[in-house]
């Protein structure tokens, strides 16, 4: 049993070559995430499932932010997402704002907000207010 070489092991020109991203049904690159985990000195060893899970989490977060930013762009009657739409999407969502609270988005602007003390006071009926002032 010396092994023929051609019959065992991996085929050199494999027809079913499939990326780990497509196996997992992801758009984000699992191989690149794995390489970055290894090169980043986060740990001595990186398991096979870790980059798949991390790529799936990153893809989910990106999809969530882009969906909310697309809604913000549509509300402003725009067809292109700009940093302002990303800022509005993140700051108006409670969980994303908590996650990205200390992140500054360039050209994002600020949320429109007027403090209650600066707003004009509402007066219901003028007759009652004038009698109460005396």
UniProtKB/Swiss-Prot annotation:
Modified residues (N5-methylglutamine): 107
Biased composition (Gly residues): 1-11
PROSITE patterns to which the protein is assigned, alphabetical: HISTONE_H2A (PS00046)
Post-translational modification: Acetylated by ESA1 to form H2AK4ac and H2AK7ac.
Keyword terms of this UniProt record: Acetylation, Chromosome, DNA-binding, Methylation, Nucleosome core, Nucleus
Marked site (Not ubiquitinated) residue numbers: 121
Taxonomic superkingdom: Eukaryota
Gene3D superfamilies reported for this sequence: Histone, subunit A
GO MF term list: DNA binding; protein heterodimerization activity; structural constituent of chromatin
Region called Disordered, residue ranges: 1-24
Predominant subcellular localization, coarse grouping: nucleus
Pfam families noted in UniProt: Histone, Histone_H2A_C
Positions where N6-acetyllysine occurs in the chain: 6, 10
GO cellular component, one term: nucleus
Family affiliation: Belongs to the histone H2A family.
Note: In contrast to vertebrates and insects, its C-terminus is not monoubiquitinated.
Oligomeric form and interacting partners: The nucleosome is a histone octamer containing two molecules each of H2A, H2B, H3 and H4 assembled in one H3-H4 heterotetramer and two H2A-H2B heterodimers. The octamer wraps approximately 147 bp of DNA.
Protein name as catalogued: Histone H2A
Organism of derivation: Gibberella zeae (strain ATCC MYA-4620 / CBS 123657 / FGSC 9075 / NRRL 31084 / PH-1)
